[in-house]
Amino acid sequence: MDSEKTVGSWDLLAKMKDIEVRAIARSKQRREQQALPFHAEGKGKQEPPEQTAQLIEFPKWPEDRRATAQAVFRSALFPAMNFKQGRPYLEREHLWSVDGVEIFFTGKQLDQSDLDVYLELLKIAHQHPFGTECHFSAYSLLKALGRATGKANYKWLHSVIIRLCGGIVDMTDHHIRYFGGLVNGGIKDENTQNYVVRINTDFAHFFKAGLWASLDNQQRLDLKRNQTAKALHAYYSTHVTPGPHTFEKLAGLIGLCNKKRRDIKANLIKAHEELKRIGFLSDYEAGEKTVKPMINHTPSQNRYIVKKVVINPAMK
């Protein structure tokens, strides 16, 4: 009798366990069905949303050149300054620029050494579509910049990348207005010192519209840390045949501020001498208030000049 009770008890427990398992299974099935996207009756499977993002490729430029939006070179976004007392923080600062370009900047003020890094990042990124992650090591980037690879420069490089991420530009070049960071962000492996960074895809519209310019990288490297000469080199690289500029205007465009007029003129003339030394300028004419540079044209610039002369014989 006791054995029959024991068998009956085990049967009852087994049935209860089976009911519990089936209840759990039904509950799980209901949750999975509720998680599925709702399809309106009679309309079948829902179509995926239309893709509105447009893939924009970088234009191709030679390995020995560095490029960015021309508004960067035609403004004081990366001024010719040396910050010995720390960098000022700017709040929607209206920067000097040429006609047709307007830039407001918020963040720690940048300089030409920041532009060195930014141009190198764009060089790495330009092999891929905008928004694609670009990979590089701190060592390789420092070597490309001609800098030593000691601990101090690794720290310096990271500070520049953070500064480029943190600065916000509101930049208009003719009909295109971009607002955002120059670098979108990224990650770093602290063991290998390898980086992954992204460039904001919206910045691509300057390139798509043809509003970009490039410069000779070896010439820029030859200028070493001469901030004034580097800024002038970048600005003049957006011109085929630049006309006379007043010293005052040049000083504003490359960010030479808070200096005496006489010192500014002397600084600019020395910078023109440097541009002549590296072969960028064949010569220049400096007057009392203006300076006119004569550029050694690239083959593509020579073709452009010939084409304009053919179209407009009055230029001869």
PLM region descriptions:
Residues 1-316:
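Charged, alpha-helix-forming regions
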